[in-house]
């Protein structure tokens, strides 16, 4: 009943998940996940609370290593490297795979220093090079138009929506290969949500973006591909339009039509 191999043969895969299982202590949260995430596309993870969406997302940059009782088994490949190899440099991995969380997390420093923070950690840039990277020409228009006149203002003084867009700018400033978004709009009003969605759509042209969302309309609007998870299993994965209009599994149809969830 569950799909076993969800590779998208017509596009290049950036992340390849193979036989992935995940545990919180003795509780298994992900069960034998097989999935290929297309490069420079937007992939949405949907499903009811507790289905494993965020857990799967956080295996990509090994956020779980912060908690000793959590562990992953299997393989996640990116550009010929198994990201679950214990020899992986976690700091560099998280530079390659950026992440934005549900609640905005601006640092208590200026907008400029927020955006430059990662560059100072991972790169040796001159002041002029740093200024050029922070410059708005490096960021999507909707973001830059709001913060260009407040670079010396504290990031924590921005509105909630602006703070979240600042966190996205901070994540992409170090030029990651993949951007993970864990319910980035759940704490925002509809107008701020619309602006974030516009920004996500722009980012999808340059980055491999993976977003977890409870908002089915958001998944339908923003993503190129969608994965539906239930009870730790990957039920269905495919092009978003196809999955929403003509899902291959009854369970998927029940969820997206509101009969279940």
Curated annotation (Swiss-Prot):
GO terms for molecular function: ATP binding; ATP hydrolysis activity; ATPase-coupled phosphate ion transmembrane transporter activity. Pfam families: ABC_tran. One of its GO terms (cellular component) is plasma membrane. Keywords: ATP-binding, Cell inner membrane, Cell membrane, Membrane, Nucleotide-binding, Phosphate transport, Translocase, Transport. It is a peripheral membrane protein. It is found in: Cell inner membrane. GO terms for biological process: phosphate ion transmembrane transport. Its EC number is 7.3.2.1. Part of the ABC transporter complex PstSACB involved in phosphate import. Responsible for energy coupling to the transport system. Belongs to the ABC transporter superfamily. Phosphate importer (TC 3.A.1.7) family. The complex is composed of two ATP-binding proteins (PstB), two transmembrane proteins (PstC and PstA) and a solute-binding protein (PstS). This is Phosphate import ATP-binding protein PstB. It comes from Burkholderia sp.
